[in-house]
A protein has these predicted regions:
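Soluble N-terminal domains of membrane-associated systems
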Residues: 36, 40-43
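Functional transmembrane core segments of multi-pass inner-membrane proteins
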Residues: 141, 145-247, 285
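Extended interfacial segments that mediate partner engagement and assembly in macromolecular machines
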Residues: 2-28, 43-187, 195
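Interfacial loop-to-transmembrane junctions
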Residues: 216, 249-275
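Juxtamembrane boundary at the C-terminal end of a transmembrane helix
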Residues: 277-285
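Transmembrane helix-loop junctions in multipass membrane proteins, especially transporters and channels
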Residues: 25-34, 125-129, 177-181, 207-208, ...
Length: 285
């Protein structure tokens, strides 16, 4: 049964991952813009779900669209401070133009469904046939989409962060009522408030180093991590900071960025939360 469950999750992740690149392209815009309506050649974006689902390729001119905004990311050779990396991911307003941004290269489109499939399979393997697995599998593609957008343009749009937090809080309620649930809904809600509050304090202390989009993302990650208890919440949150620091250290060693370089922190927050959920699922089993 576990093998079948993992296989289904793997297929689900791969299938949904194939639909993410176009949405990531459309949402990878500057804060003053809502989303893209056309390809780089100017053709209207069409396709399933009003042009939101599918590969990053224009159906009219058959040209592949870039996975990040041209010119939005610089290629400086400075490195972030790995002790407290500059992780600002603004979601509204004007980006921090005083800090340089670390270079980012386009990820091959095959990586998106692969990463989504592996994430879903890992969640299925750790969680097993418990009701919360359905919630994890529904939320995982949107988390990957957020990571893609943040990686592309260093921002976490409200169109994704706020619905994700609401969905996590609402969907875990019915899951807690079903037999075999491995977590606590009240603790999940408190976890969202606590982690979101901690990130908000960090934002107030250093708004140039912590974007308000990170605060909103922390709400949803706190909910899912809090489902398995406070220890899992701490481990998942700490793992995000650790991964971000290691990434900054790698850039420093490679001389590809500087202390004032901004790095997208959302992908590390999400990866840390994934690790926390895997550990929490295994512990609950």
């Amino acid at each position: 049964m576990y093998a079948t469950l993992i296989a289904v999750a793997l297929v689900w992740g791969g299938a949904t991952g194939l639909l993410l690149p176009r949405a990531a392209y459309r949402l990878s815009v500057e804060p003053e813009d809502t989303w893209r309506d056309s390809c780089p050649a100017g053709h209207p974006i069409i396709g399933p779900a009003r042009g939101w689902l599918g590969g990053a390729r224009c159906a009219t001119c058959d040209a592949a669209v870039p996975s990040r905004t041209a010119g939005s990311l610089g290629g400086d050779t400075a490195t972030p401070d790995t002790a407290t990396p500059d992780t600002a991911t603004p979601d509204t307003g004007t980006p921090d133009t005083g800090s340089q941004q670390a270079p980012v290269t386009d990820a091959p489109s095959v990586l998106v469904p692969l990463i989504t499939a592996l994430a879903c399979a890992a969640l299925a393997a750790a969680t097993g046939p418990r009701p919360e697995l359905a919630v994890w599998l529904l939320l995982a593609p949107f988390a990957v989409l957020l990571a893609l957008v943040d990686r592309n343009v260093h921002r976490l749009p409200d169109q994704l962060t706020l619905p994700l937090a609401a969905a996590a809080a609402v969907l875990l309620g019915p899951a807690a009522l079903l037999p075999g649930a491995g977590g606590s809904w009240p603790t999940a809600l408190l976890g969202g408030l606590v982690l979101g509050g901690c990130y908000f304090v960090l934002f107030l202390i250093n708004p140039n180093g912590m974007g308000f989009g990170d605060v909103k993302l922390a709400l949803s990650l706190g909910v899912v991590l809090g489902w398995y208890g406070w220890l899992v919440l701490f481990v998942g949150a700490f793992a995000g900071f650790l991964l971000g620091s290691l990434y900054g250290l790698g850039l420093m060693l490679l001389r590809r960025a500087g202390r004032k370089s901004a790095i997208p922190f959302g992908p590390f927050m999400i990866t840390g939360a994934l690790l926390g959920l895997v550990l929490g699922g295994l512990a609950a089993a």
